[in-house]
Amino acid sequence: DKGERDKVMRENGVGYKWDHAYYDGKYYVYFGALPVLMYYMPYKLATEADFSTYAGVFINISVFIIFAVLFVRAVLKRWFKDIPFVSYILLTQVLISSSGIIFAMRKPDLYAMPITMALMFAMAGLYFWISAYECKTKVMQGVRLFVGSLCMALVAGCRPQFLVSSFLAVPLFWNNVFKERTLLSKKSWAHTLVFVLPYVVVAVVVMWYNYARFGSVFDFGANYNLTTNDMTRRGFNIGRMPLGFFTYFLQLPVVYAKFPFVAATNLSNSYMGVTVAEAMFGGIL
C-alpha cells in the first residue's frame, strides 16, 4: 500500500526504490531480463559505461519497422498477390502507426524498452513464420520456423503479456497442420521439433528465473511492484471494462494545427475508483 509505505518512510527517514518489485527483503526488476542481456550488460562490460536507454528503444523501433515492412510484404505475397503497390505502402503505414511505437518514440524511457523489444521480436517472429514456407528447400523452411519461434519465445524475456501474439500461429499454420500436414505431424517431425524447441528452452530458462526470485515458475513479480497502488489487491474489476473499451477503440484523437498535430486525449471519467492509465492518442477505430 503506497500510503503505508510513505508513512513508514516519513517516520523512519528511509526511502524505497520506486517501481521495483520488493520480495522477501530484496529488490527486483519485474520487467523481463532480456534487454539487460542484450544491451546493458554487454555495453557495460565492453565500455564500463552505462548504456543509453534512449538508444536501445530507437534500435528496437528501427528493427521493428524493418520487419513490419517485410511482414506486410510476406502477408500480401502469400494471400493477396494482386494488391497494388500503393496499397502495400498504405497498409505498412497503418501497421506501423497503430503499433504504439510513436508513443514510445515520444517517451523512450525505461518502460518503453521492454515493450518495444517485445514488439520487435514479435514482428520478426511473425515475418519468419509467414515466410517460412516460401522457401523452396525444407532446410530453409526449418531454419525460418526455428528463428520465428525463437523470436516469439524471447518475447517472454521482454514483456510476457505480448506472448498472446504467439496465438497467431493458429490461423497462420492452420492449413499446414490440418490440410497439408507439413507441421505437427509424424511426417513433418523435423519441422515440428524446430518449431516447438525454442519455446521449450526459453520457457525453462524464464521459469527457472522466476522460481529463483519469487518461488514460483509463473510469478514474474509484477504483484510486488512498489508503485501508486497495491498491486496484490488490484484484481479484475468489470466496472473498468467500459472505460477501457471506449479508450482503446472509440476515443477520438485531439487534433491541433501545429506539428505533430495530435495530442494526448483526456481520460476524465465517472468511474468511482482508481484507474491507472497512460496517455493515449485516440482509439483504434
Segments predicted by a language model, with ranges:
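Transmembrane-helix motifs of polytopic, lipid-linked glycan transferases
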Residues: 52-81, 124-128
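Specific aromatic-rich, kink-prone transmembrane helix
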Residues: 117-137, 146-152, 166-169
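Perimembrane helix-loop-helix junctions
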Residues: 165-203
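Transmembrane helix irregularities
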Residues: 97, 112-114, 120, 150-161, ...
